[in-house]
Amino acid sequence: MKIASNLKLFLGLASLSIGTTSPALAIPVGDSTSYEMLSEPANESEVAETSKNFLGTVALSNCSGALVQFGKAEPTSPALVLTNGHCVERKLPQPGEVLVNLPSRRTFNLLDRSASNVLGTVNAKAMLYATMTDTDVALYLLDQTYEEIKEQYGIDPLTVTDQKPAAGTPINIVSGYWRRTYTCSIDGFVPELREDGWIFRDAIRYSENGCAVIGGTSGAPIIAGSDRTIIGINNTINEDGARCTRNNPCEVDRTGKIVVRKGIGYGEQVFWFHSCLATSGVEVDLQKPGCLLPKPH
């Protein structure tokens, strides 16, 4: 998991259930919930200059993310931002925990096309959903509509796919935090990706060259080629070749065989959201029949 911090920290989240609200508690740098993270900038050889387009991406204080829209949302709907569950401003979600409908004051910087400038800052009013179970996602509701953001900053949201991506798909991982783009392809899918106590299912494995993601790239959108569709969300990489430990995820196949791939990065699925969206397209309905997202116990 790729949070940026000069002290290599990992933030945490408190356990909450549907409908529960609680004041936001940011964990400061150096807190006892520290989690080792890389923070060095990427090697320029890993960045495809020709594929850089940062419109729709956002920079968080510790991670990357994107301004997103699902198919049903209207221009007058409140806008959404998508990032990793381990990037939220609260305590780290433990295995099995799901957080929903929490107040939030998180801020996100919108970047211009080349990431040379910050066009402005948008603000969350709620964290609609966050988890590190089966996937690693957090979805924020903003206090502005898509239409208002377009009028003020000229930014359109990125569309989130409703289909599972295919192996071999060329991808760009666009990090708003580092203002860098990584280019590779989807090598395949992992039935079970283990990292310490967390388990991610149907994880996206990156090809060997081009996507050696680092701290701060967590939550960056995985964009399919040049069509600007988000087909996944960047998450983690095996840094040291260790087996199933923090910052060293391992693959578990359907027979239970464990495989370690040092230097290989992974993302998580996002199409699951479509199975859980309310008719508004900006609310998560975990009781909807067929909803694939994990639910609070």
Name every feature range the model reports, one short phrase each.
Residues 138, 255-297:
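PDZ/PDZ-like groove recognition
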Residues 29, 34-54, 69-71, 89, ...:
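Conserved catalytic-core segment of clan PA serine endopeptidases
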Residues 10-20:
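Bacterial N-terminal signal peptides
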Residues 53-84, 219:
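A conserved glycine-rich beta-strand in the N-terminal activation segment of trypsin-fold
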Residues 52-63, 145-155, 180-273:
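Active-site region of chymotrypsin-like
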Residues 66-72, 125-131, 141-181:
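Active-site substrate-binding loop(s) of clan PA
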